[in-house]
Amino acid sequence: MSAPESPHEFLRRDEYLGPLVEEHGELTVEPANDFFERFVVSIIRQQVSMASATATRERLFEAVEVAPEGILAADDEVLQDAGLSRQKTTYVNNIAETFVEKGYSREYFVEMSDDAIRDALTEISGVGPWTADMQLIFSLGRPDVFPVGDLGIRKGMVQLFDDLDRRDRTAMVERSQRWAPYRSYASLYLWRATEA
């Protein structure tokens, strides 16, 4: 099956997402300028409010060079003073070590499938399926990722489909197939739907 000309034209025709596309305009999925920085920001955002994540991000970016070498050169105390928990400090160090050891970059993953990338990233201690999916969408700009592990996605699905149980992830993934090959774009609209 060939991909439709535009994700927005495709989703605009969907009876459920079409109104959200009209309301919010053309939301885009693009690769991040810096894969490693975006990865670190995803770790910062795990299980905290956006305000807390933003404050920690600002302090961390002021305290150290947010690159694999910069993170590895920094004392854990410096990372924790910037607002990272001990656990997140360990995770960020694990990611930095893996990037250095394996040569990870956006280019490294270009030819790999989403599943292969997800498998590679979740081998890093501290990186689960949610974080891997966020990297696929926001770091690598992959167009067809459906992060069903995200609470906002599940809330958005229940909002759109009143017959769905918020705990039934399998049914949500099946229902999301209607938006393939643009489920990353659909996810952006699902998140927007829950912000209202």
Residue ranges and their predicted role:
Residues D34-F35:
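Short, contiguous, helix-prone interaction/anchoring segments in small proteins
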Residues S2-S6, R13-Y16, T56, I153, ...:
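Alpha-helical structural motif
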Residues V41-T56, D81-Q87, A186:
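A short secondary-structure junction motif
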Residues L27, F61-A196:
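Catalytic cores of DNA base-excision repair glycosylases
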Residues M1-P31:
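Intrinsically disordered, low-complexity, charged terminal extensions of DNA damage-control enzymes
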Residues E26, R45, S49-A53, E62-V66:
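Short helix-loop boundary/capping segments at the starts of domains
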Residues M1, R38-S42, N94, T98-E101:
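An N-terminal domain-start capping segment
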Residues R12, F39, A51-A55, Q87-N94, ...:
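Generic recognition of short, well-ordered alpha-helical interface segments
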